[in-house]
């Protein structure tokens, strides 16, 4: 799990020591969303995980809105790379 996170950070960072930019955060949220979605397909009545998933989706949406305002082309590229639909 830590290795996957490090790979995501390495792939989406903008500088060598960048771990918290909006691009990296969106990528990490997307990874967590995919993992929780897979979990919820097997455990349909896990309502606390479902609530956590909705919170993460909201955080990712707010970051994407920020990126759309400040770096429109970067946001579009990120959404294509992560296969996120608007």
Swiss-Prot record:
Keyword set, alphabetical order: Ribonucleoprotein, Ribosomal protein, RNA-binding, rRNA-binding
Keyword Flavoprotein attached: no
SMART domains xrefs: Ribosomal_S15 (SM01387)
Gene3D superfamilies attached to this UniProt entry: 6.10.250.3130, S15/NS1, RNA-binding
Pfam families, sorted: Ribosomal_S15
Annotated GO MF terms: rRNA binding; structural constituent of ribosome
InterPro entries: Ribosomal_uS15, Ribosomal_uS15_bac-type, uS15_NS1_RNA-bd_sf
Cellular component, GO annotation: cytosolic small ribosomal subunit
GO biological process: translation
Record text on subunit structure and interactions: Part of the 30S ribosomal subunit. Forms a bridge to the 50S subunit in the 70S ribosome, contacting the 23S rRNA.
PANTHER family the UniProt entry points to: RIBOSOMAL PROTEIN S15, BACTERIAL AND ORGANELLAR, SMALL RIBOSOMAL SUBUNIT PROTEIN US15M
Job of this protein: One of the primary rRNA binding proteins, it binds directly to 16S rRNA where it helps nucleate assembly of the platform of the 30S subunit by binding and bridging several RNA helices of the 16S rRNA.
Family: Belongs to the universal ribosomal protein uS15 family.
Protein name per UniProt: Small ribosomal subunit protein uS15
Organism: Neorickettsia sennetsu (strain ATCC VR-367 / Miyayama) (Ehrlichia sennetsu)
């Amino acid at each position: 799990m830590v290795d996957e996170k490090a790979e995501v950070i390495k792939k989406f960072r903008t500088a060598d020591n960048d771990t918290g930019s909006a691009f990296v955060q969106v990528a990490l949220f997307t990874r967590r969303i995919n993992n929780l979605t897979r979990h919820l397909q097997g455990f349909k009545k896990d309502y606390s995980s479902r609530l956590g998933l909705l919170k993460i989706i909201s955080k990712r949406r707010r970051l994407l809105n920020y990126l759309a305002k400040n770096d429109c082309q970067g946001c579009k590229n990120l959404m294509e790379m992560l296969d996120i639909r608007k």
